[in-house]
Amino acid sequence: MIQEQTMLTVADNSGARRVMCIKVLGGSCRRYASIGDVIKITIKEAIPRGKVKKGDVLKAVIVRTKKGVRRPDGSIVRFDGNACVLLNNNEQPIGTRVFGPITRELRIEKFMKIISLAPEVL
């Protein structure tokens, strides 16, 4: 469950390290986002010579949450932290690599590129 002001780590090689959620997209009164949801973020910490810099405002898709996601068989997939992958305006990933595991719930048409870049799909 990600809401405004939540700090997340970045799971790609775009150059950002830590980002903060500034808006949950998908409705005017929407408060929480989960795995697979698109959020608006601002970059709080970035590496030098990266593709993005501190202060940039971008979109991101959530790929891991501490809250986890419930599967239809009743199992819950949880992670140690909250992580996202940065997107450009066309909702394509900015980075060319994705670090860490990604859940199967991201397997919708929009994010198949992220699934193909991921080293492990749970």
Swiss-Prot record:
The keyword rRNA-binding applies. InterPro entries: Ribosomal_uL14, Ribosomal_uL14_bac-type, Ribosomal_uL14_CS, Ribosomal_uL14_sf. One of its GO terms (molecular function) is structural constituent of ribosome. The keyword Metal-binding does not apply. One of its GO terms (biological process) is translation. It holds the Pfam family Ribosomal_L14. GO terms for cellular component: cytosolic large ribosomal subunit. Belongs to the universal ribosomal protein uL14 family. Binds to 23S rRNA. Forms part of two intersubunit bridges in the 70S ribosome. PANTHER family: 50S/60S RIBOSOMAL PROTEIN L14/L23 (PTHR11761), LARGE RIBOSOMAL SUBUNIT PROTEIN UL14M (PTHR11761:SF3). This is Large ribosomal subunit protein uL14. It comes from Baumannia cicadellinicola subsp. Homalodisca coagulata. The gene is rplN.
